[in-house]
């Protein structure tokens, strides 16, 4: 009986942050600037701006894909908070975003995101 309870608890932990899906985006020069034109300096801000450009301003790069999670400003603010957490992006991923125009994949989970570089 104790083993069954432990297995149930472990299964619950494993599903605590289920993957919802992913999308691919090119973080281009237009994503390095805020909507009002000032330069952004952080990778999390740039990934958030990419989603604003996709959903709100319809300024899309040819490599960009849509997503079902970051349509509103509040959802994009949540995205930025998740991107700023440890483990969301490696330091090399952050540098690639800030210093270039990489193609990224964003894996979206219930309570977190993870960003990886597909093409630098």
Regions found by a protein language model. Give the residues of each.
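Sec/Tat signal peptide C-region and signal peptidase I cleavage site
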Residues: 10-17
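Short N-terminal segments immediately surrounding and downstream of signal-peptide cleavage
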Residues: 17-31
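Short, solvent-exposed loop/turn elements at domain surfaces
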Residues: 34-36, 115
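Mature extracytoplasmic domains of secretory-pathway proteins
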Residues: 37-92
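Short, exposed beta-strand-loop hairpins at the edges of beta-sheets
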Residues: 95-119
């Amino acid at each position: 009986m104790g083993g069954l309870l432990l297995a149930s608890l472990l299964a619950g932990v494993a599903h605590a942050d289920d993957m919802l899906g992913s999308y691919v985006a090119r973080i281009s020069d237009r994503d390095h600037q805020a909507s009002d034109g000032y330069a952004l300096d952080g990778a999390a801000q740039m990934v958030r701006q990419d989603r604003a450009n996709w959903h709100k301003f319809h300024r899309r790069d040819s490599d960009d894909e849509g997503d079902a999670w970051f349509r509103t400003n509040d959802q994009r603010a949540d995205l930025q908070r998740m991107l700023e957490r440890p483990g969301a992006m490696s330091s090399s991923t952050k540098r690639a975003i800030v210093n270039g125009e990489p193609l990224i994949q964003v894996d979206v989970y219930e309570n977190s995101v993870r960003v990886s570089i597909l093409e630098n």
